């Protein structure tokens, strides 16, 4: 999970909110909202950090609509999530579909609490937190430790490690190269994209400083 810095809401969303009886379901088209969220998040899922696009993303509500309808059109409550295997059995779902109407403890868009400070990763690709409630969010509510996601994170790190080991055959990476890689993974590329599973890679690179 990567911290999200929220920007201004799309103008058409702000205009629609003034409509009497406005609801998220009736707000259309949603293209400008999706585009705004994708740009904000560097085209990665707000929860699992896999690559997303307008065609395969969902607009997640951190505070679910059924829990607090008053925030259904609040841009600060909107996040871009992957499809999370919607329609599959619950055990195979993750991210937005898996969350359902559960209110999360952790919020990647919280301006007062950086979610990255509460999340840790094991070498095998698992995500966890020392905070019991947050760990429950990650592992159970969002199902971020389902095997395909764990494997994807692990494979991404393996690729980075292999690249560095080619540069440093003795496997003693230079501090400057590590810092360079951290900077690259912390930044959007020329297409405005963050790398998939970027925080997982950054977490382990920082441990090698």
Regions picked out by a protein language model, each given a short descriptive name:
Residues 1-31, 200-209:
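A boundary/linker detector
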Residues 50-93:
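Histidine-centered nuclease catalytic patch
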